[in-house]
Amino acid sequence: MKNLIKALKTISMAMIAVLMSVSFVACNTDDDNIVNLNLKGRWYTKTESVNNLLIINDDNSIVSFKVSNYESWENVKGNLTVDGNEISIYFEDGNSLSGTCTMTDNILTINTTNGEYKYSRLADETNLVGDWNYSNITFSAKAIKDEIVIPGGTINGVEVPPTVMQTAQLSGEFIKFAAQRYFRNIKFNNDGTMAYNVLKDEGDLSLTKNYSIDGLNMTVSGETAGHKIASTFMVLQSYDNNTAYFIFNKENIAEMFIGYALMLFEGGIAPDVTDEALNAYKKAFTEAFDYYSVEFIINRAK
């Protein structure tokens, strides 16, 4: 039974990747004239269980990236052929699909026998320099343990007890609360630093961290209450450059939580986190959840 479920899950996720990859085609435009469009670049869509990024290259080769409830980062490669507005998609894993599409205002609508899918064109490169405001966050997770136990020990002569976190503490409501409280206003600078205001009972607190962007990956690093932390996740930007999407799976969201976890130590004075401690926490976190995915959205300030 377990093998059957696993097989069905694999097939379903593969089909999602195939269905979502038909956007690299020659499409009908909004005036119904069939034209060959240059669809090179990045396209993005989201369903109930999958955040999907599609990349089309000059040679009509395709790469489909996704973060789903059941998987970490995954990519599927393929190619397409076009005949008018009829397209055929072929993937290296043996899957294929045919369909048609239309495009209006940089929105691709994909019509297949299995339904309709809409993709938004993204910017080819991400540039976050400027002021941003929190917009929204979506969350999906399933805990398989009630607790996350962060190992203790003696670090730099300080006896640090194990820390126990309830997985219920890391629910969608907690994520939304934290995002609204800690990332209401964000400023990205040209020098690779970012500043944001934290809402505290006694007033706003301004914090500064470092950031870097390499293709689809963004890394944020710095110190939280004296603890060195870093997290790398996927970053995407809308075609008009006014919306940015930060996408986390359970491995890299664990890195973001390490600062919060360390604050639970008595007095908040635990020594700087080591690679060993970070790996122990990430292991405990990922083992506590079947899946955990977050999409954090910000809009450019007006």
PLM features: what roles do these ranges have?
Residues 2-14:
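Bacterial N-terminal signal peptides that target proteins for export
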Residues 22-26:
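C-terminal motif of bacterial Sec signal peptides marking the signal peptidase cleavage site
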Residues 30-77, 83-206, 214-302:
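Lipid interaction determinants
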